[in-house]
């Protein structure tokens, strides 16, 4: 099985909250697709609660588009990580990390403005696979956590696992 890019960085040195360019690629038509690691929690030390991350998934996708789309950028998808420490965001374009961090903080402010559970988009049996597994309160706790701590930048060079370590881990 090939080693995925996300597993070539040292999660023990990863800071959170922080933005990291996880991958950049070009399509056959010349568009640049950038994948960002939006790390909400320090790996192996913190984790987002399942109801909170699910609600955040519904809110974050729209709010990030409100703040980041335009000027050569269009979000394709924002999806939670299985480890529940962050989200991956794929987009067309190459915004710098600070632009992404600013949009992320603004989106978290928007999450705090949601007044009631019934304002969560697509919260129904037809549009959500587990529509009863939501918590606006938990999503807002996550948003407050991001706003209070601020958003930094994780560098791939600083986090890269040495080839020797990768070989040792995959014997």
Curated annotation (Swiss-Prot):
- Cofactor(s) the protein requires to work: Fe cation
Q: How is the cofactor bound?
A: Binds 1 Fe cation per subunit.
Q: For Fe cation, which residues are the binding ones?
A: 54, 58, 128
Q: State any GO BP term from the record.
A: quorum sensing
Q: What is its EC number?
A: 4.4.1.21
User: Any idea which UniProt keywords this protein has?
Assistant: Autoinducer synthesis, Iron, Lyase, Metal-binding, Quorum sensing
Which catalytic reaction applies to this protein? S-(5-deoxy-D-ribos-5-yl)-L-homocysteine = (S)-4,5-dihydroxypentane-2,3-dione + L-homocysteine
* InterPro entries in the record: LuxS_sf, Metalloenz_LuxS/M16, S-ribosylhomocysteinase
- List all membrane-crossing ranges: none
Which is one GO molecular function term here?
Answer: S-ribosylhomocysteine lyase activity
Q: Which family does the record assign? A: Belongs to the LuxS family.
Instruction: Sum up the protein's function in the record's words.
Output: Involved in the synthesis of autoinducer 2 (AI-2) which is secreted by bacteria and is used to communicate both the cell density and the metabolic potential of the environment. The regulation of gene expression in response to changes in cell density is called quorum sensing. Catalyzes the transformation of S-ribosylhomocysteine (RHC) to homocysteine (HC) and 4,5-dihydroxy-2,3-pentadione (DPD).
Mind telling me which PANTHER family this protein's record contains?
A: S-RIBOSYLHOMOCYSTEINE LYASE (PTHR35799:SF1)
- What binding partners and quaternary form does the record give? Homodimer.
The name under which this protein is listed is S-ribosylhomocysteine lyase
Name its species. Cronobacter sakazakii (strain ATCC BAA-894)
Q: What lineage is this protein's organism placed in?
A: Bacteria, Pseudomonadati, Pseudomonadota, Gammaproteobacteria, Enterobacterales
């Amino acid at each position: 099985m090939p080693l995925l890019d996300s597993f070539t960085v040292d999660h023990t040195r990863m800071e959170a909250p922080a933005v990291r360019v996880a991958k950049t690629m070009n399509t056959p038509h010349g568009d640049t697709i950038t994948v960002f690691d939006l790390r909400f929690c320090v790996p192996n030390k913190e984790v987002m609660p399942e109801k909170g991350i699910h609600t955040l998934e519904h809110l974050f996708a729209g709010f990030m588009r409100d703040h980041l789309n335009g000027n050569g950028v269009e979000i394709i998808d924002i999806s939670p990580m299985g480890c529940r420490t962050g989200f991956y965001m794929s987009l067309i374009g190459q915004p710098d990390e600070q632009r992404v961090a600013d949009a992320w903080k603004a989106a978290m402010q928007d999450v705090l403005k949601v007044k009631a559970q019934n304002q969560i988009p697509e919260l129904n049996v037809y549009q959500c696979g587990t529509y009863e597994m939501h918590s606006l309160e938990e999503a807002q706790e996550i948003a407050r956590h991001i706003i209070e701590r601020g958003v930094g930048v994780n560098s791939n060079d600083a986090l890269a696992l040495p080839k020797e370590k990768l070989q040792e881990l995959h014997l």
